[in-house]
Structures are given as structure tokens and as C-alpha cells.
């Protein structure tokens, strides 16, 4: 059966006739709380006017922005007029008008709106300007996608890619008739960006805010400081940017990617002046987005300590801005000098950011320095604290009191709940950001603290979104689109009162492995669109297949906005299983099973070359009779819709394929008893911290393969995962022997191998040639070096072997 993918490429330059023919009339993300389709459509043309209440400056600004966007991208000029003004020439009373009409309707809340779209009139109702703004975001998504375009330059690039398309100078824009009653499920709908690890430009921040607004997010969490960089100007303490915004170099690749670690030798720097911060705050406010700044404390403080060493417990120690990722022992020392410094910093931050919340971090604070510090031990005794955990709580409480005294509220990561005691209570209005798992959120809600949910398993967009082997270098962990969409921020088991403290959820983008704008967008979208629906749409209205349907048109909007969104959803992956005759049967399936319901066209090659529109069309499972590198991609109308250079998988066919084996030493991980995982033809994979398809051993690897009959053989190849940062070393020696009866074995080869080999992690296939011989059984013993050799990252630690596919020929 042919799999075809209808991605609606024709909608790039959609005109009214084509648009009217589509059945996907309503492709709004996030899905409205209630949408009732109606017959017909309203047409925006040169006779349309937008009417706003007289002298309502905020609504006029919203209407002006809407009209300007339409004119810029379509050439249609829509005047914005006071509601009391005369109609345009040729307009009948109450026709071809978009009417902004404020109402008093408690059911809409402060962010809800009502849209009534008929062929003659659009009525927009809301109780606040914020509600009107969100109504306009919905109108954008009811209009043809060209309306949201980033501008003429990008339209030109689209025309270059699609020369047959017509420039988007349209005579009329259709909006399908409907009635929408809409408001958000949660009051806090956030997205986050870490600029400490990698710095991002003002232009990118504005684009990020634009995309957030289109998806009705209302809070931007700006992570401004970390061990690897201090990114905000503090006038009273200029060394924070003179020194703390600069690092001498940056680790290359994954944290565990090389042993020893490799650095690029290139200085890295960047920070935002206070004027630039004000510019971003104003821009966000124009999008009805509040910014929550984060100043990390007491941990993640190396950039600050490099700038001002006397804020540490060991001022004489030399500190440098961190050049690699991770958690560092050096943290702020809880001295009065440190608190005075932090109050100075927070005073300037509070003056820059008018929002209610100040995020103070509070996560991942090692306490070894505090345990060894005579000052800290005296402070614990003086304040009658029990231990360093309570000392952290004391630190957080001091900052909490200061921020509260300024009329603001703190947000902290869920570690701020630790070290609690009757005299170390947080202020009642302290808000907990739950990141490690949902338990912190449950605990905080039951203590009557407000909670923002952002658990890593649902909301960490630095995690990989597809097959680890196929994705760019990332932190690790798996977070596909479907998992994001499945999230319910309100944990089960909370009472109604406790559940009321769950303010919403937030998507986080930590940027250790995200150095560019393009990669940031790749990691964010479309997963952020899924989260937008999680936090806006009523739980009962969520529907993942319907979300995917709407997402197909939404991708076209993102194309117009020049967003480098991930096309992982369109990936198709080859998988293999052995056949009874020693070959492999390959299937090509979507990464997301829900995509089976949408039509697509998958093509593949078996010689390692990039698939094209002329490559073999996948219709049914096919047979591999020899080893091959398979690459896959999806196409529509001859154009790739997945990334043709992305999906690549090697398969091995040999005389051992599908053959049973016996392990004489038990493994420590992996499932060698299931589907013959060492002889199933599938090679192992690795990405981030994720490893699949290998079997690990703390002792020697000792295996006997039964070929089923006597065969002429001359070579054995074994795959090993060399990952010395995780103590997975190559063997020190490999012994191979053969047998006809499985009882009496004769040695054929003993080979020394380099167990001390470090360098780049990855799979190493070692080949052992022993000349032509006849055998049914092959015994392979790979000798473990037992302890990590000197010269590697963890010398003396127990070593393991990780074995991949076995090949016999």
C-alpha cells in the first residue's frame, strides 16, 4: 500500500478559490474552547473597515497591527475607524465590517473572547484588551497562511523555491464563518530561554516573542545568568559583564562525546545592556507577554564568582567562567557581603522588569563547599540550623524576604521546598516551578503554594524529539511531539483547592547544545505549539489526531514566518527483523504512529545515497540479502517534506543473521534473549545520553553462536560501543574458537586489542580474520579490561563491555 503525505503545499500562495475548496477550514492552534462552524465566509477586501470604540487607544493599537499585517503581506488596505464614524463609500450599514465591541461578561475572564463571523460582519467581543489581542491571533489563523508572513524578503525566497506560485498580492482574503467562545485553561502559559549557555540576539528574542504571541503564550522566562555566562548589565557591579559575560572557550560536541574532552579555543561572550532589556520588555508588553527574569542563586554562580571572588567561601581560589556544562561545586557563600551584592542586583533587575515575578533559581546547589567552610558551619550554629540543607533554605528565605519587601514575588525551582522547618517558612506567595518530576508540584500545592509545572519528561525541549541516532546533538532523553501533547499539568489526586494552585505550565529550552537560532527553532517548534494547546485548550477538547491535522496547515504558517521547525514528524524509520533463510525483512514506518492516518509518500535507498523523488517508493516490506545502509525520506509533489539527509540506518546480513546464541556470562543490561538482539541485523544507536541495541557486561563477553549447519567461514566482526566517559571500554583481547558439535572447540584466533583507546565515543567494529575453516558453532570471548585504564576520564573505575551486532562470514 502506497503511503502518501498530503502536506498542502498548494497553500503557500493560496488565493480565495483554492482556499474555499479545502475541508480544513479551521486550523487554529491552540484549539479554541468552543468552535461552531457556520456556512459561508467573510471576505476582507478594499471595502472592509475595522471599527473600534472611540478613544480606546489599546484596542486601536491592536486593530492597527492587524490591518498593517494584512496590508504588508497582501496589499489589501483595511482602515481602522472609530465606531462612531461614517462607513466607507459603498458600504451598507453593518456589512463588511470587523467590529471590536467590549463587553462585561464574567464567563470570558480577563483573557477570553467571543468571535462571531458571518459573511457580512465579524464581531469581536472581550472584556479586556488582552482578550481582543488573542481574538486577533485566532483571526490570523483563520486567514490564508500568507497573512502571517515575516515579510517580503521571505516571500521572495518562497517564490524562488516554488517559481510557479503567484506573488501574494490578493484581491480578497476569506475567513470561514463560525462562532468561537474561547478562554484559556490556565492563567500561566510560559516559554523559557536559557541565554547563559549560549547568547541570542535581540532580533531572535523578538521573533521568539512573536511566535509565542501567535500561540497565545503570555509569559517569557528569561534565564539570564549561569555558570557559563552572566548576560545582563548591572551598573553597580560592572565586572559581571566585563568578566562574567565572557568565557575563554567552549566544549565541543556532547559533554561525554570525547575522552578527554575537546574545546574549541574560541572566546565566547555576549550580554544585554539595560537599554536592550527595556526594549525587549516593551516589545513583549506589546504582545501581552510578561517577562520573568531569572538570576540564579545560590548555585550556578561561577560567572558571578569569576567576576567577584569575594562572594565565594574561598576568595583566594581562582575562578573562571565555566567552559563546559554540568553542575559545579562553587556556589555563593551566604555572607552578608553576598546578600548585599544580590540585593543590589535584584534592585536593578526589579527596576527593569515590571512583572510580578522574579525567578531566583534555587536548583542544583551542591553543598560540599558549605560543609567545609568554617564560616558556614558557624552560621548554621548561630541560626540554629540543622544542616546545610537548612542553610540553603535560610539563603532562599533571605532573598524571598527582600523580593517580597519590594512588592514582588519569587519563583524558584522545586528545590526551594527542601530544608523546611517551622522557622524557615517561605512567604505564602512564593511560587514553585516544578521541574524534576510532578511530586514537587504536588507537595507545593498541598502546602498552598502556587505552582508552575515544567517537568522534564514533558516540558524540556532540549531533549531529543525523534530517534536519538538521527537527531542533532542534544542533552538526551526522549520527548516526542505526542508526549508533549499528552501532558496534563494538573496532577491527579489533588483536591479542588489544591488544584487551584496549579497556575499552568512552561516549556524550557536549555541551550548547552543549542548554539544557533536555527537549532533553537528546530528544538522548539512544533513542540511548543503542542504545549500551547496543553495550557490553553480545555482537557476535554484535546485531540491529538485533530491537532496533527491542523498542524499540517500550521507548518505553512511557520514557513511564512521563516521558522526552522523540526520535520521529525515526517520522518520514516527503517526497521528490520531476520527471516528464516538468514536475510532481513525491512519495514519503513512513521516515527509517530498517529501519522499513519495521514497520507504520505516514503522513498528510500539501500546504497547510502540521499533519497530523491526518483528513489524507490516504499509500498510493502522488502528483503535485504546483504548488508546495506538504508536512507529514507518523505516527499509530496516531488518535493522533500522530511530532511533527506537525516535518516540513515545500517543493517548487517551475515551467516549469523537470525541465528540463536548462548551467553555463558550474564549481561548487566540489554535483552539478548529477545529477538536475538546480537544477531538480528540491527546495529546499535546512540544520541545524547541515550544508547540502544547493545548488551553490556561487567565481566568477559562469552558467547556461542549456532549457525544451524556447518558453514565455511573466515571472518568474525564484532561491534563494540566505545564510551569511555561512561566506563565502556574496548576489550583487551578477543579469543575465537570453532566447533562442529558445540562441545569440543578448537582455537582459531587470539587478538590483542587496545582497551585504553579514548577519543571520540562511538561504535567500533573490530574485524578478526582467521582463514577459511569449517564450523557450525563459533565461540567468541572478549576479555574485559576490568578497570578503566590510566589516561581515560575515570581511571580505576570498574569497566564494562558494550557489545553490538555480531557478523560471521
Which residues does each PLM region occupy?
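Contiguous, structured surface segment used for ligand recognition
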Residues: 21-186, 519, 534-545, 549-557, ...
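Active-site neighborhood of glycoside hydrolase catalytic domains
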Residues: 304-306, 321-323, 327-428, 435-443
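Feature activates predominantly on carbohydrate-active enzymes
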Residues: 106-357, 398, 402, 506-511
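Surface-exposed loop/turn motifs at beta-strand-loop junctions within extracellular Ig-like
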Residues: 128, 634-638, 784-786
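Flexible, acidic glycine-rich loops studded with aromatic residues
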Residues: 410-417, 422-430, 434-587
